[in-house]
C-alpha cells in the first residue's frame, strides 16, 4: 500500500487509537486519533481539489513541524499532488527559489520557532518579500495562528478549509485509487552547497522501497511512541515522520522547537527516536556531565 492507502487503513483499523499529539499554548497535549486525523486530512484534500489542483501539480509547505505540515503533506499525497518542503529557516531568496523552481501553485506558511520574535526571520514576512515575483503562485494559506500576508493571494486557514465544503470525499478517494507507483510523491531540495538547490523527485514506489528496507532492519508496533523534531523538509524526517509513522500506525509526538527535543524525549519516553550526530553528542555530553557531577 502507498501512504495515502495506509492512512485510510489506519482510520478503519485503529479509529480510536492515538495518531498525533501536539502541545497547545498552555503546554497541554492535544491528541487526534487516526479517525480524527484522517478526517482532518480529508478536509485539506477537498480544499486542494476545490482550488483546482490537478494531479502532479505542486504545493510548498514553509514551516517547522506542526499538525498542518503533516495534514497538508498527506492531503497532497491523497490528492496525487506533489508536496514540496521548505525549511522554516529559509531566507526570502531561498524560499523564492524553491517555490519558483518547483512551480508550486499553493504555499502553506507556518512558523519558525527560532525567530526570537524577529519579524525578519518569520516565514510569513520572508515570503511577503518575494511573493510578487512568484507569478505561478495562486494562493498562500496561512496556518492556524499565523498573521496573514498583506497580499491578495493570502487567505486564512479557516478560509482555506471552507473552500472544500462543496467537494465530495469520493473525489479524493478516486484520486487515491488512481495513484500509480511511478507517480511523483514529493520533491526534496538539496542543500545547494555547489549552487542552487535541486529538487529530487521521489515516487510512491521510492518510499515503499525505503520503508521495506527499514523494516528489514527494525520493527516497531502500532501505538508505540515517536518524537518528531527533525525538519520535515529533510528526507530523513519525511521518511520516518510522514511515511514510516503511517505504515506502523505509531503515536507521533510533535516537538514545538528543536531546542526542546531532549526535554520532549524525557517526557514522552519514545520507543523510536531519530537524529543527526550533533544531537547524540549533546545528549552524551549532558549525561557525562551529570555522571561526573555525582562522582
Predicted regions and their residues:
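Conserved pre-ATP/AMP-binding loop-to-beta segment of ANL
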Residues: 15-18, 142, 154-155, 165-189, ...
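A short helix-loop-beta submotif of the ANL/AMP-binding
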Residues: 57-58, 64-92, 100-106, 224-225, ...
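Conserved AMP-binding/adenylation subdomain of ANL enzymes
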Residues: 208-225, 232-295
Amino acid at each position: 500500500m502507498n501512504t495515502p492507502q495506509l492512512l485510510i487503513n489506519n482510520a478503519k483499523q485503529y479509529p480510536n487509537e492515538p495518531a498525533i499529539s501536539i502541545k497547545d499554548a498552555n503546554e497541554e497535549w492535544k491528541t487526534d486519533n487516526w479517525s480524527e486525523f484522517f478526517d482532518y486530512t480529508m478536509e485539506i484534500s477537498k480544499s486542494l481539489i476545490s482550488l483546482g489542483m490537478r494531479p502532479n501539480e505542486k504545493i510548498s509547505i514553509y514551516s517547522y513541524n506542526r499538525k498542518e505540515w503533516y495534514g497538508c503533506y498527506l492531503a497532497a499525497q491523497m490528492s496525487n499532488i506533489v508536496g514540496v518542503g521548505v525549511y522554516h529557516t529559509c531566507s526570502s531568496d531561498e524560499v523564492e527559489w524553491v517555490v519558483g523552481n518547483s512551480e508550486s501553485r499553493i504555499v502553506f506558511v507556518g512558523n519558525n520557532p527560532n525567530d526570537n520574535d524577529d519579524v525578519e526571520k518569520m516565514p510569513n514576512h520572508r515570503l511577503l518579500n518575494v511573493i510578487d515575483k512568484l507569478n505561478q503562485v495562486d494562493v498562500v494559506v496561512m496556518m492556524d495562528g499565523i498573521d496573514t500576508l498583506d497580499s491578495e493571494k493570502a487567505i486564512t486557514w479557516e478560509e482555506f478549509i471552507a473552500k472544500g465544503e462543496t467537494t465530495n470525499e469520493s473525489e479524493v478517494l478516486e484520486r487515491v485509487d488512481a495513484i500509480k507507483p511511478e507517480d511523483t510523491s514529493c520533491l526534496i531540495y538539496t542543500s545547494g552547497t555547489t549552487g542552487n538547490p535541486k529538487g529530487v523527485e521521489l515516487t510512491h514506489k521510492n518510499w515503499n522501497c525505503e520503508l521495506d528496507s527499514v523494516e528489514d532492519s527494525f520493527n516497531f508496533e502500532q501505538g508505540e511512541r515517536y518524537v518528531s523534531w527533525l525538519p520535515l523538509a529533510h528526507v530523513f524526517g519525511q521518511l520516518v515522520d510522514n511515511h514510516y509513522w503511517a505504515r506502523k500506525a505509531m503515536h507521533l509526538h510533535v516537538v514545538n522547537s528543536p531546542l526542546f527535543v531532549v526535554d520532549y524525549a524525557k517526557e514522552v519516553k519514545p520507543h523510536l527516536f531519530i537524529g543527526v550526530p550533533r544531537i547524540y553528542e549533546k545528549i552524551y555530553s549532558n549525561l557525562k556531565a551529570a555522571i561526573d557531577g555525582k562522582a
